[in-house]
Amino acid sequence: PPSSDLDAVVRDADIVILATPSAYLKDFLAPLTVPLRDKFVVSAIKGIVPGDYQTVVEYIHDHYGLSYRQIGLVTGPSHAEEVSRGKLSYLTVVCADPENARRIGERFAGENICFSYSADLYGVEYAAILKNIYALSVGIAVGLGYGDNFLAVLIANAAGEMTRFLEESYPDERNTQVSAYLGDLLVTCYSTYSRNRRLGLLIGHGCTVKSALNEMTMVAEGYFAADCIRHINFRHRVDMPIADMVYRVLYEGASARRCMQELTTKLI
C-alpha cells in the first residue's frame, strides 16, 4: 500500500525507484536509515545533484555503496502524459549489468511501451540531463519569435554539442543518433508537454527568470542542470555555446535576446 514512511517502503522493496527532482534528492533521502546496499536502485531522474555536481547514479554509488551493476536508469523519449493516455511510447533501460536491465524492463512492461537496452550509464544519463538545457534554449528561441528554420539549426547544433561533450568527457563506443540520446532530445525540445521548453518560452516572452520559475507548476530540471553542467565542464573545457548561453540568461541576468543573437553567429 502507498506509504510516506521511507524506511518502511525501502525495507520491503527489492527494487527502489527514485523519481524526485534532483535538487531535492539529498533532502528526500536524508531520513533513510535502511541500507540500500542490498537493493537495486532505478533512477528516473534527469538531473544532477546540486552542490555535489554528480549525476544521480554517481551520487548513489558514492554515498550509498552500491555497485554500478546495482543501479539502473529509465529514460525516454517519453512524456508521462502520453504514457498515461495509452500512446505508444519507447523507454530505454540502462544498467552496467544487461540481465538487471532486462529485469527492470520486465517490471515496466505494458501494452503500449517498447524497450531498448543500454550499458552506457554515463552517456545516457548525461544526455538526459543536457537535453533539458537544450529544450530551455528552444523555448527561449520560440518566445523571442524565431521560426522553425532556426529551431532546426539550433536543435541540430544541440545534438552535436551533446555528442561532443560525451565524447570528450567520457569516450566510449556509443551511437548518439538513437532514441536514448537524439530521440529524447527531440521530444523534449519540441513537445508542448516539456517543462523545460515551457520555462524557456516564458523567459523568451519577457518574464524574468524568477517570475518564470514562479509560473511553473512542476520542476524544470534544466534550470538546475545549467548551473551544474557549467561547473562540471570547468574540468573538461568542452566548447558548449548553447549551454553557456542558457547559463548566462538564467544565472547572470544576461538579455535573452542579445544572447540568442550572439549564439546565431556560432551555429552551423
Where are these regions (language model features)?
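Electropositive phosphate-/nucleotide-binding environments in soluble metabolic enzymes
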Residues: 3, 19-22, 26, 35, ...
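Rossmann-like NAD(P)(H) cofactor-binding subdomain of soluble oxidoreductases
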Residues: 3-11, 15-86, 104-106
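Fold-independent oxyanion-binding glycine-rich loops
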Residues: 5, 20-21, 44-46, 74-77, ...
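Alpha-helix C-terminal capping/helix-to-coil transition sites in glycosyltransferase folds
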Residues: 11-12, 130, 182
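Internal alpha-helical scaffold of NAD(P)-dependent oxidoreductase catalytic cores
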Residues: 24, 35, 59-69, 88-175
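General beta-strand structural signal in soluble alpha/beta enzymes
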Residues: 43, 69-75, 115-119, 177, ...
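NAD(P)-dependent Rossmann-like dehydrogenase/reductase catalytic/cofactor-binding core
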Residues: 138-142, 167-268
